[in-house]
Every structure is written in C-alpha cells, then in structure tokens.
Amino acid sequence: TGLSIALVMTLFIIFYVKFAPIYPEYNRNRMLTVTKMKSYPKDNDKSWNCSAVSYDEVKMLQDLPHLEAIGATASNYRENYVEVPDNNEPISVTPLYTDAGFWKVFTFRFLHGKPFTQADIDAKHREVVLPVSVARKLFATDDVVGRRFNMDAQEYRVCGVVEDVSAATPSSVGDMWLPITLNSWVTSDTTGKLVGSVGIYMTAPDAEDKEALKEEVR
C-alpha cells in the first residue's frame, strides 16, 4: 500500500542520512569516533567514571600507524549571543569548538577564506568560520572574510565561510566554529586523566584500514 511504501522510504532516508557519506562527513566509511570514556581503578571496576574524552588523548593517538587524520570538538554547553549591526536584539548561537585536525577529518566546502590554523589555536586567536546562512544574517552578504563582530562582549574575526551544514550531521554541525583553546572546559582540563570534555574523530587512509586503526586505539 501507499502507507507501507512511504514508511519504507522514510526508514531508508533515515538510514541513509545516519550512515551514508554526506556533506561534510564524506569519510564515514573510514572514520572512528571516541566520544565517551569510562575509567576505573585497575583493581576495582565498580568504582568508575564515564564522561567525554580528554583533549590530551589527541596527542596520545596522533602517531598510530594506520591513522590518516585526527581531530577534536567540544561544546561549551550554553548559548552565546552575537551582536547584529543595526539590530538591538542579539542572536543566540551554539558554537562548535574544534582543533586544526577537524578540518582534515571533515570535508567542508569553503566559499570564502580558509579554516583557522594550528598557530591560531595555540595563540587563542578569536578566529571564526561561519556557515553562509549565519554570515548573511550578520552582514547581509557572504564574502565577509576579515569582517569582525562581537559575541559575549568579545571581538571575533571571520577567517572563512562554508556551505551550511545539516543538523543531520551532529558530529560536525555548528552555528559557527571556533578554536578549541577558546573553550574554558577544555583549557581547564589539566588533570591528565583520560576523561574530559571533547569528542575525538579519526580517519584511516582507506576503509580497509579501519579495523587495524580500531585495534591500535584499543
């Protein structure tokens, strides 16, 4: 019947969006994610702690033999407010904080400019990549590299503009992307533990290398 066909098509679309290679997550078939970590004393597995992952783990994993790229993301668990020119009402945004490797793991289409660099991240420069819809909302145009705006009373500079990202790709979507070192949850995590506040994303050179990379991570 028509209803059963519609249901099958709906399930197919959901499955496709969740698992197929779609923008900007084209590398799903060779990607590994580490977004949760459970830690406990060697002699007591009942006393455990489960959380996101420490940013220190990026350094621990970056020399694995079957690793092509590794990146990290973090949220600040709250909304930020951007001042819009000629508008008394600020707009709320939810940024995604990333490192330089993020732009190698995920394949964004840059319309203008480029991503922030490792030097920007190390220096905590307030560089930002905007999706085109947010760029137009803030500046009424999309070629805005070098333009500046205020968010939560801090000035930021636009270094790149990308095609919009769908909410169906939660690992990479954001209202804007900022250097991960601007996230206080990440920079305050100096305990040296495996648990922390980031998610880690890795790609193997080929889909055939994914299982080998998984074993190396373990």
Set out the residue ranges of the language-model regions:
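Generic structural signal for small/hydrophobic residues in well-ordered secondary structure
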Residues: 1, 18-20, 32-36, 61, ...
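N-terminal Sec/SRP start-transfer signal
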Residues: 1-8
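Conserved SAM-binding loop
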Residues: 7, 95, 202
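Membrane-proximal extracellular/periplasmic loop immediately following the first transmembrane helix
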Residues: 12-82, 196-198
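A structure-centric signal for secondary-structure junctions around beta-strands
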Residues: 28-31, 90-92, 124, 155, ...
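Short acidic/polar micro-motifs at solvent-exposed secondary-structure junctions
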Residues: 37-51, 72-101, 115-127, 166
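Mid-to-C-terminal secondary-structure elements
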Residues: 99-115, 126-218
